[in-house]
């Protein structure tokens, strides 16, 4: 068999292969340098960045579940200026695009972040986390109302020339409605799914396990939900999808691509296996060779081929 093409295009961002990392599970990337060759990744998605430094939520803020984990980190980060000053320079030395995940308390916050990062050398694209509370609207998450999600997307789009990837929340009634809203507002690509809202209770203390009470559920438990939503969104809009949500191995990653994902992000698996991204990349290569696939793009949306219309 001839050479295999692994290159994909995620909304204007060229990736050497479809494997990247889920924000918040890979630090700023450099933490994993002792375990893997970061230059082999298709992209590095760094942890959520805000305008000002954030200490995050009180502890405990992580808990293991039977098929995944709960987290309520609270977007702990040093702030965008410190990120650009301290963390971005070493990332520039790696031959891998850097995607910065951004979060805000208001539409204006998102616009300012986009403007600041647009001028930062070494930032390849922005991933917009809309699963944040809108302080001006009583704390309702931007990602649960189409109009709010569109407003955030528009603010980012108007302040950057870089590819804009909007990360959708699964905690909605109709994921396709949200997808259409942000695509119409200027999103170049979509990332889904973010974590599902969950909780756990310690029966000995009779109290919630997390200090924040509720947290984001990730890991294998949410894979069927993520696959279903990616499948639906692929049929609803015509922009690339960055798929995530319970990807633990190459079989999972391939299933996400068959459902419609152009690229995939590895999250919770990084905590249990620091080499998960490399194992998944190698597994995708082996699958393609075994199945006679010459171009990984052939996999994207292939699970829809039996349908018409």
Curated annotation (Swiss-Prot):
Binding residues for FMN? 23, 47-48, 101, 129, 167, 193, 219, 245-246, 267-268
Q: Which Gene3D superfamilies match?
A: Aldolase class I
| Catalytic activity of the protein | (S)-dihydroorotate + NAD(+) = orotate + NADH + H(+)
Cofactor, free-text remark: Binds 1 FMN per subunit.
Q: What EC number(s) does this enzyme carry?
A: 1.3.1.14
Which one GO biological process term can you cite for this protein? Answer: 'de novo' pyrimidine nucleobase biosynthetic process
The UniProt entry's GO CC annotations, sorted and at most eight, read: cytoplasm
Question: Which Gene Ontology molecular-function terms are recorded?
Answer: dihydroorotate dehydrogenase (NAD+) activity
- Where, by residue number, is the active site? 132 (nucleophile)
Q: Kindly give the PROSITE patterns that the UniProt entry links to this protein.
A: DHODEHASE_1, DHODEHASE_2
What SUPFAM superfamilies does this protein's entry cite?
A: FMN-linked oxidoreductases (SSF51395)
Quote the CDD domains the UniProt record gives.
Answer: DHOD_1B_like
> Entry's NCBIfam families?
PRK07259.1, pyrD_sub1_fam
Subunit details: Heterotetramer of 2 PyrK and 2 PyrD type B subunits.
Family according to the record: Belongs to the dihydroorotate dehydrogenase family. Type 1 subfamily.
What exactly does this protein do? Catalyzes the conversion of dihydroorotate to orotate with NAD(+) as electron acceptor.
What is the name listed in the Swiss-Prot or TrEMBL entry for this protein? Dihydroorotate dehydrogenase B (NAD(+)), catalytic subunit
Q: Species name for this entry?
A: Heliobacterium modesticaldum (strain ATCC 51547 / Ice1)
The top of its lineage is: Bacteria, Bacillati, Bacillota, Clostridia, Eubacteriales
């Amino acid at each position: 068999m001839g050479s295999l093409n692994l290159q994909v295009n995620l909304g204007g961002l060229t990736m050497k292969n479809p494997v990247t990392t889920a924000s918040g599970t890979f630090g700023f990337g450099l933490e994993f340098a002792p375990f893997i060759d970061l230059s082999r990744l298709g992209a590095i998605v760094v942890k959520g960045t805000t305008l000002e430094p954030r200490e995050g939520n009180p502890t405990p803020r992580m808990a293991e579940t039977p098929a995944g984990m709960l987290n309520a980190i609270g977007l702990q980060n040093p702030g965008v200026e410190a990120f650009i000053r301290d963390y971005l320079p070493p990332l520039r030395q790696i031959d891998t695009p850097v995607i910065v995940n951004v979060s805000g308390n208001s539409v204006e916050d998102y616009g300012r972040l986009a403007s600041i990062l647009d001028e930062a050398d070494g930032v390849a694209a922005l991933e917009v986390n809309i699963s944040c509370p809108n302080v001006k609207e009583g704390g309702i998450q931007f990602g649960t109302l189409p109009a709010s999600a569109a407003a955030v997307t528009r603010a980012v789009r108007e302040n950057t020339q870089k590819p804009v990837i909007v990360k959708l929340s699964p905690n909605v009634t109709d994921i396709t409605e949200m997808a259409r809203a942000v695509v119409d507002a200027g999103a170049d690509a979509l990332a889904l799914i973010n974590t599902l809202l969950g909780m756990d209770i310690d029966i000995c203390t009779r109290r919630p396990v997390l200090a924040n009470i509720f947290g984001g559920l990730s890991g294998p438990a949410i894979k069927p939900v993520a696959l279903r939503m990616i499948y639906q969104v692929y049929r609803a809009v015509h922009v690339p999808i960055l798929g995530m949500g319970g990807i633990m191995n190459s079989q999972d990653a391939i299933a996400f691509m068959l459902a419609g994902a152009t690229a995939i992000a590895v999250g919770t698996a990084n905590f249990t296996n620091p080499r998960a991204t490399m194992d998944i990349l190698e597994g995708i290569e082996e699958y393609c060779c075994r199945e006679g696939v010459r171009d990984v793009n052939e996999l994207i949306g292939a699970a829809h081929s039996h349908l018409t219309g």
